[in-house]
Amino acid sequence: MTDPCKPQACAIQGCLTKTGFDESKCSHLIDSLYECCSKFYNERGADARTPCCPVPSLLRLKLEQRACGPLDAKRVR
């Protein structure tokens, strides 16, 4: 099985590398991954697994947290 969310996960890794691991600058890509993962579980069910997505219960928690405001770590200089 190919991982449908691998491009989003790889984009996060590239962004983190490019920005010196400043997670706050990659927030839009993290959101994109979580959207992809939500679609993945909606289409394939909660028992589906992929290495690029958190398990459904953790994904729900992450989405709830992100809905409350910015949570990404900012790099301390």
From Swiss-Prot:
Cited Pfam families: CMC4 (PF08991)
Alphabetized InterPro entries for the sequence: CMC4, Cys_alpha_HP_mot_SF
Any one cellular-component term (Gene Ontology): mitochondrial intermembrane space
Sequence motif: Cx9C motif 1, positions: 5-15
Nucleus is among the record's keywords: no
Compartments in which it is found: Mitochondrion intermembrane space
Primary localisation category: mitochondrion
Record-annotated CHCH domain positions: 2-44
Disulphide bridges, residue numbers: C5-C36, C15-C26
Domain of life: Eukaryota
Stated family: Belongs to the CMC4 family.
Domain note: The twin Cx9C motifs are involved in the recognition by the mitochondrial disulfide relay system.
Protein name from the UniProt record: Cx9C motif-containing protein 4, mitochondrial
